[in-house]
């Protein structure tokens, strides 16, 4: 028995059968176009050796396509009604593939490695606007085994995640996700392929974790780098010298640390790349040591 993907009619019938009404608070919009589903899964690069962490499986459109790739899937769904229905839907539309599916009824922001029997190698997620960035950063931090990420988010969030330094959309999320890997856009998704139809376009973003990280990845180092990113964008139009003055202890010390990191103190924080923030933290420690020696 081959896997049958869900269409618009089936999705609406499923929702009716279980007396389900989409909730705005959960950002519930379900893809019903098979071509879009195949495009997302193809762009994710998922294959049969992967263990995929799927966030927000909903009624199962993407889940079926991921299983069709031969992957093992752990689907995390916050809505108890949808989590309960998902195994039945998968069983009805496939055959032995149900044996490669695990469903958890849980808030993704509380998910930890200890909750999973096997650790994921890939993440595929349909993330609502209000939790997209926190959820993504949480999963990248807590699940280092995840090597590739494909997320579908509101177009505005996609633009922010993939923005380059100095651009109008570049900000805290843009810099922080690059701590983990390379980021690129994979196009737009029309509102018409969803039920219910959202008011905005969605965007696809892929993140590939660095094969070998250019910098330390421990939690303490990451937290210090992220603090610098937060400082820089709290008043993004300030010069770096002024933005980091309180952190460094004075404007002069801020300038000295920036110069030690080969950063022009007159540059605005919004132009700094993740490598600049990392270098600033690393060189500031060296600068402090030189002051103590003197």
UniProtKB/Swiss-Prot annotation:
Disulfide bonds: none
The keyword Transmembrane helix appears for this protein: no
Pfam families per record: RrnaAD
GO molecular function: 16S rRNA (adenine(1518)-N(6)/adenine(1519)-N(6))-dimethyltransferase activity; RNA binding
Cellular localization per UniProt: Cytoplasm
Keyword check for Transport: no
Catalytic activity: adenosine(1518)/adenosine(1519) in 16S rRNA + 4 S-adenosyl-L-methionine = N(6)-dimethyladenosine(1518)/N(6)-dimethyladenosine(1519) in 16S rRNA + 4 S-adenosyl-L-homocysteine + 4 H(+)
EC number(s) reported in the record: 2.1.1.182
Keywords (A to Z) from UniProt: Cytoplasm, Methyltransferase, RNA-binding, rRNA processing, S-adenosyl-L-methionine, Transferase
Binding of S-adenosyl-L-methionine, residues: 29, 31, 56, 77, 107, 126
Superkingdom assignment: Bacteria
Cellular component terms per the entry's GO annotation: cytosol
UniProt function note: Specifically dimethylates two adjacent adenosines (A1518 and A1519) in the loop of a conserved hairpin near the 3'-end of 16S rRNA in the 30S particle. May play a critical role in biogenesis of 30S subunits.
Family to which this protein belongs: Belongs to the class I-like SAM-binding methyltransferase superfamily. rRNA adenine N(6)-methyltransferase family. RsmA subfamily.
Protein name (Swiss-Prot/TrEMBL): Ribosomal RNA small subunit methyltransferase A
